[in-house]
Regions:
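Central cavity-lining transmembrane alpha-helices of secondary-active solute carriers
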Residues: 80-98, 396-409
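Extracytoplasmic gate region of multi-pass secondary transporters
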Residues: 59-64, 274-304, 335-403
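Glycine-rich segments within core transmembrane alpha-helices of 12-TM secondary carriers
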Residues: 148, 168-198, 495-505
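C-terminal ends and interior cores of transmembrane alpha-helices
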Residues: 114-130, 427-449
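A late C-terminal transmembrane helix in Major Facilitator Superfamily
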Residues: 182, 481-517
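C-terminal membrane-cytosol helix-exit motif in multi-pass small-molecule transporters
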Residues: 235-257, 272-291, 302-323, 533-540
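Extracytoplasmic
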Residues: 40-71, 185-189, 355-360, 505
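Hydrophobic core of transmembrane alpha-helices in multi-pass small-molecule transporters
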Residues: 133-149, 449-469
Length: 550
């Protein structure tokens, strides 16, 4: 007798990109067929996502080296480069969170990975020219945001391949190992800048005017460096990864039924990404000071304006079958859990990516300077500190800790529940933020700030550890609360909003450093964490919680 699924296209052919029969909750199907395909897609997704994070986050390291090379920009202007990459990547995640259902997993991951070739190449080109205007560097930082968008589509895609009981583990592996892109970038870029690995094709070296560093220690002023390799190096991995995505990944037709021909899918992706760039550029133009922008609005207006504009543009500009697909996925905004989980993911991932972006330059400014008063007793922050720690030797450790521990957060949450884990890490983050703020205050008022560096570094490692565990727990909770049709878009949406931490953190910390009160940034973050701790208890842990410890 024919079975219910006998006339369906089999899901067992590795060469068949489109799968029409997908039943991960069916144990027999999962063990015989689904498990192999799901893990193959996962292990291709991870390095692709890693490179996305690397390209997105690399301006945090590049700006430190630009300062060491004497690029003619102020500290505030260098902070804007990191922030621009942050806001662009966050905005790209808004359309990216919907792409899997509109264009298919394999189509989306392939194209968005291949798209990274352009900003990697462009960044390498502009970094060879100290005399180019600031807007040229800002444009490249904006373009690098494509890498930030990849997280939303990657997580949305992987969530569709695995059964609910493995959501925490699978998403933790994809996100945690993908997050290693930040650490990989912070280790690889200082390394490749020390050697002219591309020969004559890679351009000429520049000479350091300040001490720099890499994972093994300091690099003295006067040493030649190839800062352009910070962009060029990623071409070596992006080309083979793009090929691997195309030939090794799959589209699940049970999730993405109407993707059309791959060229049609590519057109949808490109169209939605182009739409998302418009509000990013508009928001940045209104926010950034002259001459790049007009400086009319604050960051706290720019971010919600950017989010609302991106959603409206997508909603109004979509057409045909794409309009119906976008409208259907907008239904997630009617669910109160979408909003609660968005806030909680800002606590975890927003902090992880925000600190990853802001920490290198913050360390350089706080610990690389001897803070001494002038003859009038006014504190000055211009005297170079000869005993300063090498920023590039330490900046990678925090993101490494956060990324490494994230899969553990998902695994533990699968065992004891995601919300209780989130509650614990939120409490830790409140205390650690207050403590690190106090240490920053002490260091920024000291002629020997390096004496405070070990405690500063240790407390930030604790913060990164907590964010990593929390990243895994919050994504596990989303996988349990929402059904299979909504879980992917919600994962993408929450990651999009949390990614604005990559814009907010560098600006907030940079502004407070400029004001002479860096501790206030950390105290403000602690207040937000405390509010979200109460939110998590109300929604998921109290006696009559909406959903008990998902």
């Amino acid at each position: 007798m024919a079975t219910e699924h006998s006339n369906r296209k089999p899901a067992t052919s590795a060469s068949d990109a489109d799968i029409t029969d997908w039943r991960p909750e069916d144990d027999a199907f999962w063990e015989s067929t689904g498990k192999r395909i799901a893990y193959r897609n996962l292990w291709i997704s991870v390095p692709a996502l890693l490179c996305g994070f690397a390209v997105w986050g690399m301006w945090g390291i590049i700006t430190v080296q630009m300062l060491n090379l004497g690029f003619p920009f102020t500290q505030a202007e260098l902070f804007t480069l990191t922030a621009i990459a942050g806001i662009s990547g966050a905005t790209m995640r808004i359309p990216a969170s919907f792409l899997i259902r509109l264009a298919g997993g394999r189509n989306t991951i392939f194209l968005t990975t291949a798209m990274l070739l352009a900003p990697a190449l462009g960044t390498g080109i502009v970094l060879q020219h100290k005399d180019w205007p600031l807007w040229a560097f800002q444009l490249m930082a904006l373009w690098c945001g494509v890498g930030g968008g990849n997280f939303a589509s990657s997580m949305s895609n992987i969530s569709t391949f695995f059964p609910k009981r493995l959501q925490g583990t699978a998403l933790g592996l994809n996100a945690g190992l993908g997050n290693f892109g930040v650490t990989t970038m912070q280790v690889v870029i200082p390394l490749v800048m020390t050697v002219g690995i591309f020969g004559d094709f890679g351009g000429e070296a520049m000479t350091l005017i300040k001490d720099s560093g890499w994972i093994f220690g300091k690099i003295a002023a006067g040493t030649p460096t190839w800062i352009q390799n910070a962009g060029f190096a990623w071409l070596l991995s992006l080309v083979p990864l793009s090929i691997l995505c195309w030939f090794g990944m799959n589209n699940l037709k049970t999730v993405s039924a109407d993707t059309g021909h791959p060229l049609v899918a590519f057109a949808k992706i490109t169209y939605l990404y182009t739409l998302a760039f418009v509000p990013s550029i508009l928001g940045l133009y209104l926010y950034l000071p002259k001459p790049t922008g007009v400086g009319l609005i604050s960051m706290w207006v720019a971010v919600p304006l950017d989010i609302v504009s991106a959603l409206l543009v997508m909603k109004l500009a979509a057409f045909g079958a794409m309009k119906e697909g976008v409208s259907k996925q907008f239904e997630i905004f009617r669910n109160k859990h979408t909003w609660s989980m968005t806030a909680l993911y800002i606590v975890t991932f927003g902090s992880f990516i925000g600190f990853s972006m802001a920490l290198p330059l913050s360390m350089k400014v706080i610990f690389g300077i001897s803070h001494v008063p002038d003859v009038n007793g006014v504190m000055q922050h211009t005297l170079s500190n000869p005993n300063a720690p090498s920023v590039l030797s330490y900046a990678w450790i925090g993101p490494f800790v956060g990324a490494a521990i994230r899969p553990v957060g998902g695994w533990v949450s699968d065992k004891i529940g995601g919300s209780i884990v989130t509650q614990i890490v939120s409490a830790v983050m409140v205390l650690a933020s207050v403590a690190v703020g106090y240490v920053m205050m002490q260091a920024y008022g000291s002629a020997t700030p390096e004496t405070h560096f070990p405690l500063f570094l240790g407390l930030f490692m604790l913060l990164f550890f907590a964010t990593g565990i929390g990243n895994g727990s919050t994504f596990r909770t989303i996988g349990v609360i929402f059904d299979r049709q909504q879980a992917g878009p919600v994962l993408g949406w929450t990651s999009a909003i949390a990614a604005y931490g990559a814009f907010v953190a560098p600006i907030v910390i940079g502004d407070q450093i400029k004001a002479g009160t860096p501790q206030n940034a950390m105290y403000a973050f602690a207040v937000f964490y405390a509010l979200c701790l109460i939110l998590n208890w109300w929604f998921y842990l109290r006696a009559n919680a909406y959903v008990k410890n998902p």
